[in-house]
Amino acid sequence: MSQQEPDDSRNCIVAVTLDEESIGRSGPDIEHERAIAIYDLVEKNLFAPQGGGEGPYTLHIGITGNRLMFDIRREDGSPVMVHLLSLTPFRRIVKDYFMICDSYYQAIRTATPDKIEAIDMGRRGIHDEGSRTLQERLAGKVRIDFETARRLFTLISVLHWKG
C-alpha cells in the first residue's frame, strides 16, 4: 500500500490578527508594512499544525516575555493549539536583515545597478536563513513550506521593526 501525500488544500491560514496589547501599534509606515506582510501570508500559504485536524486556520500573534505566541484556531474560532516560539534565535538574523535593508535603501538612491544587485542578493540570503530557522523551530509542531516560512519571517521582522 503506497503512502499518499496529504491533501493540503485546506491547510492554510485565512486570517492573521496581532495582539495589540503585547505588540502595540506603530507609526503609519510600520503599520503599512505589517498589513502588506499579513496580506502576502494569507494570500498563499501552507500551514498544518500537528494533530490539528483539517484547516483552514486563523492565527493570532502576540508576544509574551521573549516568546512569540502563535494562537492557532479553526475558522469558527475553536482552539487548535497555542505555540510559544523563542525569539532569541531570530534576534541576530533580524538585526542583520534590517542592517542590509538599510544599506539597500541607501544604495538604490546612489549606487550602481551591480552594487544594488549584490546588496539585494545578501538581503535575500539573510531572509532565507531566517526562513529556514523558522521552519526548523516549528518542525514537529506546525508544518509549513519554505514560501510560507519566508512570509512568516517577513511578518516577524516587521513586528521587530521600531521604525
UniProtKB/Swiss-Prot annotation:
This chain's protein is named UPF0262 protein RPC_4416
Source organism per entry reads Rhodopseudomonas palustris (strain BisB18)
Q: InterPro entries in the record, alphabetically?
A: UCP032146
Q: Which NCBIfam families match?
A: PRK02853.1
Q: Which residues form the signal peptide?
A: none
Give the protein family.
Answer: Belongs to the UPF0262 family.
The family database entries (Pfam families) matched by this protein are listed as: UPF0262
Look up the domain of life of the source: Bacteria
Which HAMAP family would you find in this protein's record?
UPF0262
